[in-house]
Amino acid sequence: MFEHIPVLLEESVSFLITNPDGIYVDATFGLGGHSKRILEKISNKGFLIAIDRDLEAIELGKRKLEAYKNVKIVHSSFSKVDELLECLGIEKIDGILFDFGVSSLQLDKQERGFSYNKEAFLDMRMDTTSKLTAYDVVNFYSQEDLEKIIREYGEERFARRIAKAIVERRSKKPIETTTELSSLISSLVPRPKDGSHPAQRTFQAIRIEVNGELDEIKIALEKSLRFLRSGGRICAISFHSLEDRIVKEFFKFHSLECVCPKDIPVCRCGKKKELNIITKKPITPSKEEIESNKRSHSAKLRVAEKV
């Protein structure tokens, strides 16, 4: 049985729940850790919608919630949260929780092809019913596109070198496995000073491309804001700077009253403030949490409340 330890569990759920009788969304169900805690905190009148695009995670995680009747688990991407809520006849919610990134199930299960340490087919799909795989990205994307993805999504300064080497290698034989790709990158890139694996940034970049992760986040944040009732909250846990930047900028933009240029004396944009930022600085894991769950070390929780 795979176990995914929920990150910032108490902090995120305590910020999320403002009304025990309210309607909440766990947009990243995973193995159900956050959902279970939410259900423990809300009343029998409260209701939880849990979403995940990983069918395997849902099958494993739903066992934790068998005792609860006030929950609906849905296989979908969180960017479709508006459609899901409309189908359920829900007009407003009291809060939504996002826990971005890859789960321990996806990382630890060898055949899912997420890990640079375990040999598997280059897959990396969070939703195994989707078509695009890491194999497709690595073997069919142009050198220019590969370089752009690795630089932008992986923040990898050796992106050009890596992209060129991938194209050269695949011209002789397709790159089929995680360890093939990982070994190739390791032969090109010095080990980072922070001790992380040389292939970590490139694998992150390819995973983000395969799953459209950053676009999903942007779409889901916008849609969820429309469904939040006044006083409802968005809680977002990110694990790298790209995710965190999207959340931070989204909260900032929607907390502003006017976005007209400063040289315009009278507001013409008509923009209204929609959010109050609750966490002026992101909440990070305690030393104790990091020691017990090393994967939590980069987590950041940001919270905003609907005006």
Curated annotation (Swiss-Prot):
It catalyses: cytidine(1402) in 16S rRNA + S-adenosyl-L-methionine = N(4)-methylcytidine(1402) in 16S rRNA + S-adenosyl-L-homocysteine + H(+). S-adenosyl-L-methionine binds at residues 32-34, 52, 78, 99, 106. GO terms for molecular function: rRNA (cytosine-N4-)-methyltransferase activity. GO terms for cellular component: cytoplasm. Pfam families: Methyltransf_5 (PF01795). Its main location: cytoplasm. The keyword rRNA processing applies. It is found in: Cytoplasm. Belongs to the methyltransferase superfamily. RsmH family. NCBIfam families: 16S rRNA (cytosine(1402)-N(4))-methyltransferase RsmH (TIGR00006). Specifically methylates the N4 position of cytidine in position 1402 (C1402) of 16S rRNA. This is Ribosomal RNA small subunit methyltransferase H. It comes from Caldicellulosiruptor bescii (strain ATCC BAA-1888 / DSM 6725 / KCTC 15123 / Z-1320). The gene is rsmH.
